Amino acid sequence: VESYEYETMYNLESTYWWYRGLHSILLDVLRSLGMDTTSKVLDAGCGTGQNMARISKSITEHVYGLDYSPYGVWLCRERGLPNICVASVNDIPFSSDTFDAAMSIDVLECDEVLEDRALAELRRVVRPCGYVILVVPAYDWLLSEQHHRAVRASRRYSRSRLASLLRKHEIHVVRMTHLFAALLPAVAAYRFALNYMDRSPNDCPRSELKPLPHFINESLFHVVDAERRLLRRMDLPFGSSILAVCRKA
């Protein structure tokens, strides 16, 4: 991720609809898996740390994070998060069988990440019968050149491809569902429009993360929050992201 994207993330992560909605979904997932105040949770690729902050406040203080960006880690520490280190998901600096759950949110698709190595590392640091939680972007046809250059991510996934990768590493899928289903048509239309816009090759690539008017931001959050409640009862067959909840076999 470009360094200026970390600053944007830090400034928006606590209020932006997408982050608020996703982090609320992840809290529901952790609670459904029985995580409590004694649980140890790893956020591998923690960005600027808002997900960690919410887990620490709502579930357990034993939450640890790593990110390959020193600037991202510095911003995490600005949030008051102590258990942070500069490291790659390709080489996680924790002992085997350490965590009750290890999550990696929108990381596997990044260009610097070696899929097989990262999944093997996530499995290694989780305790026997512990959980690996992944969120990845869905559908190759949703690739956006500007956005993915800015976040340095060139992969998107189908459910079958992700499931195959997990089976290869003996990570048992407990649940796999799409996310952001209701907003998929709008996301697709926006991405297609961006891809057809003329851009100078010298333009500094920017992600789609930018402040929105309050009414729009809150409206989008309420759509995602309604979907969060629906996810407590069922899986979604389509959506712009995929959530995989897995158990160490």
For each predicted feature, which ranges?
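Short, glycine-/aromatic-enriched active-site segment of Class I SAM-dependent methyltransferases
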Residues: 9-10, 133-155, 161-164
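Short N-terminal helix/helix-N-cap motif within the alpha/beta-hydrolase-1
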Residues: 50, 112-116, 144
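Residues lining the SAM
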Residues: 105-108, 135
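Conserved S-adenosyl-L-methionine
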Residues: 171-181
